[in-house]
Amino acid sequence: LKINSCKASILTKAINTPYDISGTFYDVGEGIAYIRIEGFDKSVKYRVEQLLREFADFEVDILEMAESKNFWQNVNDLDFLKEIEGDLWRVSVKPTDGSRIIEMLDPNIGFLDWCGGLVWLRVDEGLNVREKMQKVEGHAMCLLGGFDQFHPTSTLEKKLSNSIRNKFDPKMLFNQEILN
C-alpha cells in the first residue's frame, strides 16, 4: 500500500493493527508511507481491505505485484539515496524518535524504515549526526563520510565487546578491519 500525504506516525498506527504488516517505509520529503503485506492471496486481499478501511481518511494506492516488488527491492538496495549528495548515515532509535531525528537534522533526504526506528539520512558533508542527536537515545553509523563508521563506545562496552570477541574468535580471524 502507498499512503499519500501523511505523517510518519501512520507507520505506528499501521503496525499496531492486527493485519500482520511485513514492512514499512516512510519518505520524509514526500510525506508518503509504504506498507508491505505478504502471504497467501486470500489473506493478503483480506488484510488490504481492512487496512483500506483503517486508512479511509487518506489517499491510498495499491501497488501491483511487479511495482511493489520493484519498490521494496529499491528500498533494500538503498536506491533512494544513491544520487543524493552528502554523507550517508544509518541511525537506529526508538520508532517514536525517528521523526525527531529528521526534525533535528533537516537532512538533504531522509527515510524511515522499521516503523520509524531506522532512519536513513543524507546530510551535508561534515555534519556530525552523533553530536546533533545527543538528546535522543540511539546509535548512528556513518556509512559514507568523514566520520568513524561505528558509534563510539564506553570503556566498559569496549571491554565487554573484546571479551566476547576473544571467546568466539580467539585468533582474530574474522572482521579484523571492522573490529579493530
Residue ranges of model-derived segments:
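C-terminal substrate-binding/cap subdomain adjacent to the FAD-binding core in PCMH-type
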Residues: 1-85
